[in-house]
Amino acid sequence: MSDDPGQMLLIYDDPSDQRSLSLDDASSTEESPDDNNLSLEAVHNAIPYLGQIFLTHDTAYEFYSTFAKRCGFSIRRHRTEGKDGVGKGLTRRYFVCHRAGNTPIKTLSEGKPQRNRRSSRCGCQAYLRISKLTELGSTEWRVTGFANHHNHELLEPNQVRFLPAYRSISDADKSRILMFSKTGISVQQMMRLLELEKCVEPGFLPFTEKDVRNLLQSFKKLDPEDENIDFLRMCQSIKEKDPNFKFEFTLDANDKLENIAWSYASSIQSYELFGDAVVFDTTHRLSAVEMPLGIWVGVNNYGVPCFFGCVLLRDENLRSWSWALQAFTGFMNGKAPQTILTDHNMCLKEAIAGEMPATKHALCIWMVVGKFPSWFNAGLGERYNDWKAEFYRLYHLESVEEFELGWRDMVNSFGLHTNRHINNLYASRSLWSLPYLRSHFLAGMTLTGRSKAINAFIQRFLSAQTRLAHFVEQVAVVVDFKDQATEQQTMQQNLQNISLKTGAPMESHAASVLTPFAFSKLQEQLVLAAHYASFQMDEGYLVRHHTKLDGGRKVYWVPQEGIISCSCQLFEFSGFLCRHALRVLSTGNCFQVPDRYLPLRWRRISTSFSKTFRSNAEDHGERVQLLQNLVSTLVSESAKSKERLDIATEQTSILLSRIREQPVSSLAIRDISSSVQRNF
């Protein structure tokens, strides 16, 4: 006989306790567990035997479960006999192998979906039967039947722990998991953190990733109406703690949550400086509620993605998109971006045209390219990569004429005349092709590196594992973490010594004004400018590489007004002067980049000014007072030299022109009037 109890053929039965055992009987009843410990007979390596005594039926169950785990199977409570109210109460219990019985055949019901679930039951006859004995007022349970013959393979010790009966999540671990979920980390990351905390090898926790997902899913299965109420209460709670937090929502005819949008104080402050170009990513859904999720993001002066706002919509129709855009511009004090980049969505396109008529709408190229494999891979086959390379070449061309000719040749070469995706791409070319977009500011968000950073930033919001009400908190955690990381990155960049490559006064001046990130972009153009020659013509300059005999870019420069422009339109597109314009400035003995070509959005911004502005953001009167103080300081500082005065006059004129383009409210006029009366 084998020493392994799991492989022994043991069948014991007490003839004095003969009752039939049908493992197909599913009418088992489970009682509440008792707190009694195992009897002294239940030593670790013990095997059940006839006549074995237990104080309670739960103690017997624990003993048999320990034996089963050691053997390589698990058990379940099967059937009880002598139930309360029938006579003597509960008198007999059966514990069986988890593979006992057979799966009943379900009848197919028309119109009802059937779950294709596999069963592990195979008619195994292994069991333990215990009977209740009462003597002299004392109750105990005695083993009256035991069989350890299995008709299936038993599991190894490293396998048996995966059986559901031996997997459990303690209350302490549940609390940790729910706390982790609020931070938005993935289930895999939760598992790894718990493994490190408990000092166990990977995969040796008493539960699996599936158990964690089921736990988190159980917290989502709430009444949708309760979810909506909790979500709105959460937003209101945040609003009470932070008055600068903003949110808007709509209810349908049944008073159920239809749409909701929100933004944080730090996001609104960032938008004031960096909201000129915005990505509105609407390609994701929030799994907790299966609602389309829209996220507004941008890029700050250090080239780091920054969060502007979120929206959840029930439907993706024109009405919903219009509401979302109205809510967003409302958060941002009516200021619409210069450029907004989105996925290809006709309803969204129409909504942008209606709600943001002065905003340039463009398509995110990485969202478009992400659909290419499903659109073209099958049709082009081995030629797909060649076609994709040609597409990128056309995408980066500088002139519309070159693009149009190249596109026609590409369609002919690859035989794509009847391809509907090619036709749709061509019809929307003004929304994604760089030759059509170079005159619009995109803050470099079409670059591959920048798009990857933005996409990675957005993914941080999509790992939310818990309820809808927690999602707004999770987003806040990610935003706060990103803000802190950005501040640290900003400090590190500012502490680094900037290496000047040309030694030109223009370079050192730009280095003192721009952030290290922005300066590195301008510095690239400054270095390249030395390789270009400029030729003065009747209308401006012609600039081309010193090795070229023809072609080039046309540069127009008006020194008296400090205005310069180039036909390559790099400044209009990215906010950095191009090599061609810098070459002309150098030729004209200009030792500083004109201030208007060092945009505020790429400059080093005073932290103290930013904080002062934030603290006064809610009180209109205080903001007017702050502005008056700034103007007074501006006048006193500008009067110290002619150069300072010239700069102040020029920049103030530009600022006034921009201000006069903005709408005026009657409330603001009254506040200004009262403020002026108080101060004069």
From Swiss-Prot:
| GO CC annotations, alphabetized | nucleus
A GO MF annotation of the entry reads:
zinc ion binding
Please state where this protein is localized: Nucleus
Question: What are the protein's UniProt keywords?
Answer: Metal-binding, Nucleus, Zinc, Zinc-finger
Report, as the record phrases it, the tissue specificity of this protein. Expressed in hypocotyls, rosette and cauline leaves, inflorescences stems, flowers and siliques.
List, alphabetically, the InterPro entries matched: FAR1_DNA_bnd_dom, FHY3/FAR1, MULE_transposase_dom, Znf_PMZ, Znf_SWIM
What causes induction of this gene? Up-regulated in hypocotyls by far-red light treatment.
Source taxon at top rank: Eukaryota
Keyword match Nucleus: yes
Task: List residue spans of SWIM-type Zn fingers.
Answer: 556-589
> Which GO biological process annotations does it have?
regulation of DNA-templated transcription
The chain positions of domain MULE read 277-373
Note one Pfam family from the annotation: MULE
Q: Which family does it belong to?
A: Belongs to the FHY3/FAR1 family.
Q: Give the protein name, as stated in the record.
A: Protein FAR1-RELATED SEQUENCE 11
Q: What is the species of this protein?
A: Arabidopsis thaliana
